[in-house]
Each structure stands twice: as structure tokens, then as C-alpha cells.
Amino acid sequence: AKEAGIDICLISKGDSIEINDASGSRSTANEEADGIMCLYPGPCDTALDRNDMCLVLKLTDGRFSGIFGGDISSEVEKKLVNEYGDELSVDFYKANHHGSRYSGSADWIEALSPRWAAVSCAAENRYGHPADEAMDRLMDAKCRILYTMQSGQIKYKESAIYENNRQ
């Protein structure tokens, strides 16, 4: 990244990243404004499974919010629900750990209450992702589920979700 002239930014819980709008002007990112907020891990967090040290990021742009938790398990989800509660509510959820049965707990989904969820996984992958029980929890929450194995690329643009260039 450095050779390509890309800035590297190390973040942890409580840090935020400003979002530039289309005009190039910057907004100040904080808990109330547009930006990306890191919810986890903090400098003192530890885990036996390195997947549980993935960044958990919440994106807010004024019209839209989404949460991205990498490969965290239900154990980290539980910590976050206990800490943030209703503040976790979002429009969009990128399913943790490719829709693994070890993530996407009922309490997590209830706290997020997403309208859309994206599951990133290949068809017929060796892990069996996504797990039926994880998808059932999303369906029980009346969440529209998008799968990259069916739709390919999923994009967010101007407060809309697009599957492979279809809204």
C-alpha cells in the first residue's frame, strides 16, 4: 500500500474515519455524524481465536447505516450487544464469518434489526457457508438476504443496495 501511495490507518475501538462526499468535502466523523466508527476490538481486547480480533465497523452516511464484523463469532457479538444495545441498529448487515453457524446470533440480529444482509461466500464451498441456522435467524427477522454466490458483486450507492448492477 505504501509503495502505491495509499495511506495506512491503524484503528481500534472508538476511532473514526471521516467520509468524503462526492464534492470532495470532508465531514467530521463522530458517533452522531457521517463516517466509519470502529466498535471493536479495543487496545486491551484479546481472544483465543484470531477471527475474534477482526475489526467491527459501523458505517453511517446520514441516510444509511451498515455494520461489518469480519469473522467475529457469537461471543464477540454478545459483548457488543451488551455494550452498545440499540445503538447497533442498522439498515445493512454484512453477515459475519460468511454466514457461519457460529455467528449471527439471535440477540445480535435483534439488536441490528437490519433490512438487508449480504452473505459473502462461494457456492459449494468446503465450509458449508452459509449455515441454514444463521440464514433462518435472518429470515425470522424479515431481513432481505443477498448472496454473493448468486448475485456476484453487491454495491451500496446513494442509499440503495445493488446486486450485480441491479437495484
Residue spans of the language-model regions?
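Non-globular, low-confidence helical/coil segments that flank catalytic cores
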Residues: A1-Q167
